[in-house]
A protein has these predicted regions:
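A short, Lys/Arg-rich alpha-helix, primarily the initiator
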Residues: 1-18, 26
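DNA major-groove recognition helix of helix-turn-helix/homeodomain DNA-binding modules
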Residues: 46-62
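Residues within the helices of the helix-turn-helix
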Residues: 21-22, 50
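Core alpha/beta nucleotide-donor-binding catalytic domains of modification enzymes
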Residues: 70, 74-220, 230-234, 239-241
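Recognition helix of helix-turn-helix/homeodomain-like DNA-binding domains
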Residues: 28-44, 66
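DNA major-groove recognition helix of helix-turn-helix
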Residues: 12, 38, 48, 56, ...
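Conserved Class I SAM-dependent methyltransferase catalytic core
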Residues: 205-279
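S-adenosyl-L-methionine-dependent DNA methyltransferase catalytic core
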Residues: 29, 69-133, 178, 247-250, ...
Length: 444
């Protein structure tokens, strides 16, 4: 008895593992150990088990079923059928772009937002020309922000799990009486539980991707927009994204994704997000031109462009100890510009951990875009110090960097406001994505 090398090679291809060296590293062994395992002389069954099989004249599969039948579903992972059902996320990556700057809607397009937060995605889609018919959000401060800025929006405050289970059409604030054009939202990135075979929605229960999928299946919009952190691409070795793509495909959508950098779309911030677009299959059959992501803008704003004449606002100061350290860092610099003894003391164990770590003790320059804003302005690993003052960015500066207009007011404590802005999709990035969707829908 030996390991089927053909099945291993096929599984490596499906999981984007190029070499046996890479496979060996992933499973925590040396290349020579893996080569020995895959040789014709290697038997994966221990000698005592073989002796038991031979003495009792019981085949291996029958013995395993008899002794550990409850785990057989896991053993079925490596079968021709299950491997054939796996998908390669990179086959869904779309590198097609189109100029959308002069696009305007030719019809009254509707959008329902899930996980709306403080409204970055919603506002951007509105600026593109989509009309909000609902915004679902749990956080009370974010809901107050949405209601303050858009009193006419149907802000549906509540747990999306309960809303989806009860049916969005049954909610008193959902009054759409026609086909929905766009469903949008950025659900959290969470690992899934695998049973060995794909069962569509059954694979994703217990995650916040599940209610999003429920609402998608209930409303069957023409198009959906899902955005997330760039890390989703390789989260859980790609299985998380691949399961999402599988579920979307089973729901009747042709799916595309790409990672878009906000700096390429008139935002003074290097912030990368994965954007997933799904188009209902009946539209795919009728389309005259395919969907394309928005073409990169020639404008590359930097911090001085974003913060020009920014209004004063609340903010969080550094501690005196941290302020003394950051005073030593020049604009555009970070911990590498500190004296060695101060850098070692400030960074602690991170000083010896290797890697880039250029976010620590980082002061942004006026002549560069900001690095990705976080939900807290003074986290040690991801500091974003003001260029000419030794302090974190204030909340209106945060909002400007995220391309919110000054007219967009935020509700809640300073901590809550930082969190709302830091979690948001940059408004201008959302607008570009919305224009690309409108450009596609205009053909029907």
């Amino acid at each position: 008895m030996f390991i089927n090398k053909d099945i291993v090679k096929l599984a490596m291809k499906k999981n984007n593992i190029a070499t046996q060296t890479e496979l060996a590293e992933r499973i925590g062994m040396s290349k020579s150990q893996l080569s020995q395992m895959l040789s014709d002389d290697f038997c994966p069954i221990k000698t005592n088990v073989l002796n038991l099989m031979n003495e009792l004249k019981i085949p291996f599969k029958e013995l395993i079923i008899e002794e550990t039948g409850e785990h057989m579903e896991q053993l079925e992972l490596i079968t021709d059928e299950s491997i054939a059902n796996n998908i390669n996320r990179y086959e869904y990556k779309l590198d097609r772009y189109t100029d959308v700057k002069n696009i305007s809607p030719q019809k009254d397009y509707t959008v329902l937002e899930t996980f709306a937060g403080a409204g970055g995605l919603s506002l951007g889609l509105e600026e593109a020309g989509l009309n909000s018919i609902g915004a679902i959000e749990l956080d009370k401060d974010a809901c107050k922000t949405l209601k303050k800025n858009r009193p006419h929006w149907n802000v549906i405050q509540g747990d999306i799990v309960n809303i989806a289970n009860n049916g969005i059409k049954n909610h008193e604030l959902f009054t759409l009486d026609k086909e929905l054009d766009v469903l949008s939202g950025g659900y959290p990135c969470q690992s899934f539980s695998y049973a060995g075979k794909r069962h569509g929605l059954e694979d994703i229960r217990g995650t916040l991707f599940y209610p999003y999928s429920q609402i998608l299946n209930e409303l069957t919009p023409k198009v959906f927009i899902a955005e997330n952190v760039k890390g989703l691409v390789n989260h859980d070795e790609g299985r998380t994204l691949e399961t999402m793509l599988d579920v979307f495909s089973q729901s009747g959508y042709t799916v595309y994704w790409n990672v878009l950098n906000a700096w390429n779309y008139d935002v003074a911030q290097k912030r990368e997000r994965i954007v997933i677009i799904g188009i209902r299959n009946d539209l795919i059959k009728k389309q005259k031109k395919p969907f394309a992501f928005p073409e990169i803008s020639t404008t590359k704003p930097v911090l001085k462009d974003a913060l020009k004449n920014v209004p004063d606002s609340q903010g969080t100061p550094y501690s005196e100890k941290k302020k003394k350290v950051l005073e030593l860092v020049p604009p555009g610099g970070c911990w590498v510009n500190l004296p060695e003894n101060i850098a070692k003391d400030y960074m602690g164990a991170s000083y010896h951990s290797g890697g880039g770590k250029r976010g620590m003790a980082r002061r942004i320059s006026w002549d560069e875009p900001s690095l990705t804003l976080t939900t807290s302005p003074s986290q040690k690993q991801t500091e974003r110090c003001h260029p000419s003052e030794t302090r974190p960015f204030k909340v209106r500066e945060y909002a400007r960097i995220q391309s919110f207009p000054d007219s967009w007011k935020f509700e809640g404590s300073v901590t809550s406001i930082y969190k709302q802005i830091g979690n948001a999709v940059p408004v201008k990035l959302a607008k570009y994505v919305g224009l690309a969707v409108i450009d596609y829908l205009n053909q029907f």
